[in-house]
Amino acid sequence: MRSRYIFLVIIFGLATLVWSAYLFALQIFDPFKLDRFRQLRYIPDKEILIPTRGSIYDANGDLLVSSISYYQLDIDRKAVSLWAKKQKMDLQEAYARISKVLSNCSALSAGDILKRLNLNDKLTSIQISNKIREMELDRIISTFDKEKIPGLNYSFASMRRIYSKDILAARLLGSVQPVSDGYDPETRSKSLYKLNGICGIEASYNDLLAGEYGWREVVYDANHERVPYPNLHEKQSQDGFNLKLTIDSKIQEIVEHALYEGAVKYSAKNVGAIAMDPNTGRILALAGVSPEDRNIDPGLVRVKSNIPLSFMFEPGSTMKPLTMLPALEHKLVRPNEKIACGVYQVGKRTIRDTHHYGALTPKEIIAKSSNVGVAKIAERIGKKRLYEKFISLGYGQKTGLGLYGESSGLFRKPDDWDGYTLHSLSFGQAISVTALQHVTAFSAVANGGKMMKPYIVDSITNKTGQVIQQFEPEVLREIASKAVTDTIRSYMKAVIDDGTGKHIKMDYITIAGKTGTAQKNVEGTRGYSSGKYTSVFVGMFPAEEPKMVLLVFYDEPAPGYHYGSTSAAPTFKKIVEDILFMPNYNIIGFDERMTQRSLQMPDLRGKHISQAEAILNKYGFLYKIEGVDSSSVVIDQFPKANVSVDPHHPITIKVGSGLSKADSLTVKGTMPDLTGLTIRRAMQVAAKHKVPLKIKGSGIVRQQSILPGSLITGTAACTIEASI
């Protein structure tokens, strides 16, 4: 019996010795097998790394669009409970400590956090918030690590697109929407959060703006705490590229303001305009608006069609200078030749001029806008030459701008023309164009005959500001000689000096332009509507060496305003005047007489209407007021503050019950808009404006007792109500 016992002891001893030796050898001499053994126990999860969508800037570097990422924050109460026991701490004391840390590192209220931690005892994990910003999250993680507090879990929640200038360029910039990409086998994720551009620049450059997902492997223990682990893999996310546009937001604002004003004044269905640098093809402003745009949510405006690219219209008499190009080029007319105008019979069709002018020279035909004169010249040009010239000017095809929604226009081949098409084309009928096509064609007239490719993105940069791609002017082709285009420009200058556009002539800058009026085509037919028109004006300045080409068009303006000379031309003039008054904007040919009589525009925002009128009257400004109300304050003005203004140029003052949110935060002497701000941020803004606060609740400010934009009087406190 004793020998058997000794034998068993020896056997177990040897087994223990062999096992210990094996483990020792495995750890010292064969770490890879041990590592594989560990991997059998811990299978890493993959955490998705979401890229930040790229930002969009204007030509001056002003931010137009950016992104904010939000994260979800959860607390594992089981882990906190175990930690509290180890620390010999009451659970409520532990919750209070966590609440304090979170509130100190974010805009969250400690009281609200504590309430959430005590909700529903059956839940192990409690969501604290899904609106934690990245900087707040970094502070929270750092503090939890420093104080060795367990139970913190976080994940990406959402991304929000911020349009810094509100409704400005809304249709051009477009919009995004969150989408799910479905299951991704690489990251083993069921859905990938993504903001997808659905219209405008956001959609056209979506692949560049979106960025690329990344991932990293993470290992959790039984308490769902991350644990350090060797040899984990990671693929960094790539943030989206940034876009710098050719759009000058100051010019864009001037254009949009004039278009909104005109849309209301002339009761138009839609209004559009494009400003282009003819020497480069850079688009300086591109706007399309409807009268109701300012009364609806900006998000709804962003998804509307980009009118200057998509809306097709017959250009009317604005086509006449372009018809004259091949006639001069092939010497089919002489500069001093007189052509009989007034009435012209073509088969069964009678072509008439608005007025019976008699015989006119080519310059007078353009200045007086004679249909008969240009139709007779078109007969000399012939089908083939006119068709080829219009094709070389870009009609019937997209411009190559690269934005979604651009139309090609409608321009039939000569085989599809009838006996009247040649004559109709000469004065802008039987062809449909877009504003972009038209302004690009006239830019070639402005620059000496070079057809430039229009572009709207100046450069693409990464998040560090490094230029990835710089776009340069591109000449597509020569459409005429400089001598011919100079002559056409002189004809267009005669329109302003002595013709149909003389009412928009300015003392301090020369303009070459052309008015146009066209009946709208009845959809699905070749007939025309009796009461619906498109009015157009295209001009360039200074006339001698144009630095800008500007086209304005109205879709279905009210009767009496349906002529290009009565709606589009006055709007053109207003835009040009306001551009010329922009600080630091130098147009060659700009007469010094204007600067000698200019005054600096005062900042009237936030002032009571009576105060604003007193200031304007003191300096002799001409002005008009929109939305008059005896209790109103100035909520907007045009031109903006500190701009040099001709006192004889009418100023527009818009009044209402309060300023916009952005203005209310900066205008002194008025109540700022605190809604949507955190309590901490609201306190900072209120202190800057010297407004005492009474605070109810915590989290985000939802209501305030003093209306934004109201004049601040005395020391009355503003009560704000906040909630998460």
Q: Where do the protein language model's features map onto the residues?
A:
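Periplasmic/cell-envelope proteins involved in peptidoglycan metabolism and beta-lactam response
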Residues: 1-296, 384-396, 405, 504-507, ...
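Extracytoplasmic
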Residues: 49-52, 59, 66-72, 123, ...
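Soluble non-cytosolic domains of exported or imported proteins
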Residues: 51, 85-93, 130-135, 195, ...
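Beta-lactam-recognizing serine transpeptidase/beta-lactamase-like catalytic domain environment
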Residues: 65, 220-234, 238, 271-317, ...
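Preference for bulky hydrophobic residues occupying beta-strand positions
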Residues: 73-75, 174, 245, 311, ...
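Bulky hydrophobic/aromatic "packing anchor" residues in well-ordered structure
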Residues: 140, 172, 205, 339, ...
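Residue-level detector of short coil/turn "hinge" positions at structural boundaries
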Residues: 151, 270, 334-335, 397, ...
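Ligand-recognition elements built from short beta-strands and adjacent flexible loops
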Residues: 505-508, 522, 531, 552-724
